């Protein structure tokens, strides 16, 4: 029975995600520019290295989407084989220091004048799910290859904390680093295209993201629109976003007795901010035992799957958070947390 429930849940999630992907693809074809306005010279020197990984065949994508995911309509978007490349590029860490990050680039084979698309990935717990790692044949990279097969060159940033930076904690829902890692991935991608003499069409880049990727997409859009950029955002599509972190945090703490869709996400968020902003209180002031010990022992170090992480956390927020933390927050006594959250609000 348990396996059947999990299978149904996965099918429902695949259906929901495919419907969002299908709508996004239709918008891409409808709204994308068609004029060829390639950049003559890269403005930023960010690309460090590139490596060809593999080619994803149309038949493999059709097997995944039509057979495994049960989405026969996906076949109409699968028009090209897709070459997958891993790249390493320069970006900034949480302290503004230079650091090498990684990502994947998906190039449709023999596609005439493909458009540009950057996909910011959703919340992940395992480094194996990072785009450049591409650990399994049915990986997230394989799933996103449908966008490239439809006729787009796709940039997939890992974010900090994954790929070549997997030895460091991921700054979860952190505006500055999500925006910079995604933006610098695009800059490195443009250099990659020029170095490999790959032509593309348009003077803008479409941006999409789901869950944490939706937050990253809006942060990236803001960065591109307010700072120097050789490209401007074209279509911007976001699914299941949380932009107003302060209001979301208020709601969560005021409704800790209500069912939570992703307890692990809230634990990840609080642990990440505790690390980024060096909160003065120990984790045990926020999380009940034994969850505080599990988090301190590396629950979010990228070595475990989402199911493994979830199995080590409670099902309710009241079990996760200490009563003293909840009371402090309600009394307006969590200045460090509230300040950090407000700094990352996007609305």
Where do the protein language model's features map onto the residues?
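Alpha/beta-hydrolase active-site loop
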Residues: 172-195
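C-terminal motif of bacterial Sec signal peptides marking the signal peptidase cleavage site
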Residues: 30-32
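Primarily recognizes the serine-hydrolase "nucleophile elbow" in alpha/beta-hydrolase
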Residues: 187-258
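Conserved alpha/beta-hydrolase
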Residues: 137, 143-164
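Short, surface-exposed "cap/lid" segments of acyl-processing enzymes
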Residues: 95-100, 108-146
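Bacterial N-terminal signal peptides that target proteins for export
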Residues: 10-22
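Accessory cap/linker subdomain of secreted extracellular hydrolases
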Residues: 239-346
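Catalytic-loop region of hydrolases
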Residues: 36-112
């Amino acid at each position: 029975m348990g396996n059947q429930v999990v299978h149904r849940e996965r099918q429902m999630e695949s259906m929901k995600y495919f419907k969002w992907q299908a709508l996004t693809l239709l918008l891409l074809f409808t709204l994308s520019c068609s004029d060829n306005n390639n950049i003559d010279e890269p403005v930023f020197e960010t690309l460090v290295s590139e490596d060809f990984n593999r080619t994803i065949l149309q038949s493999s994508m059709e097997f995944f989407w039509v057979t495994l995911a049960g989405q026969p309509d996906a076949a109409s978007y699968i028009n090209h084989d897709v070459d997958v490349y891993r790249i390493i590029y320069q970006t900034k860490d949480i302290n503004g220091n230079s650091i090498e990050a990684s990502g994947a680039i998906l190039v449709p084979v023999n596609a005439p004048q493909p458009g540009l698309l950057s996909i910011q990935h959703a919340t992940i717990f395992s480094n194996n799910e990072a785009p450049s790692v591409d650990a399994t044949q049915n990986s997230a990279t394989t799933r996103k290859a449908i966008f490239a097969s439809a006729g787009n060159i796709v940039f997939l940033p890992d974010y900090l904390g994954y790929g070549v930076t997997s030895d460091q904690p991921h700054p979860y829902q952190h505006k500055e680093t999500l925006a910079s890692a995604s933006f610098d991935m695009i800059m490195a991608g443009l250099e990659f295209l020029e170095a490999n003499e790959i032509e593309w069409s348009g003077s803008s880049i479409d941006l999409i993201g789901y869950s944490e990727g939706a937050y990253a997409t809006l942060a990236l859009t803001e960065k591109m629109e307010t700072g120097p950029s050789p490209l401007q955002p074209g279509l911007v599509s976001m699914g299941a976003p949380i932009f107003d972190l302060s209001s979301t945090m208020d709601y969560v703490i005021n409704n800790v007795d209500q069912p939570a869709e992703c307890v692990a996400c809230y634990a990840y968020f609080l642990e990440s901010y505790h690390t980024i902003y060096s909160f003065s209180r120990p984790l045990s002031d926020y999380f009940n035992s034994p969850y505080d010990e599990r988090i301190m022992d590396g629950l979010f170090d990228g070595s475990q799957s989402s199911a493994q992480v979830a199995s080590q956390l409670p099902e309710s927020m009241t079990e996760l958070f200490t009563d003293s933390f909840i009371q402090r927050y309600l009394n307006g006594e969590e200045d460090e947390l509230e300040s950090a959250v407000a700094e990352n609000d996007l609305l």
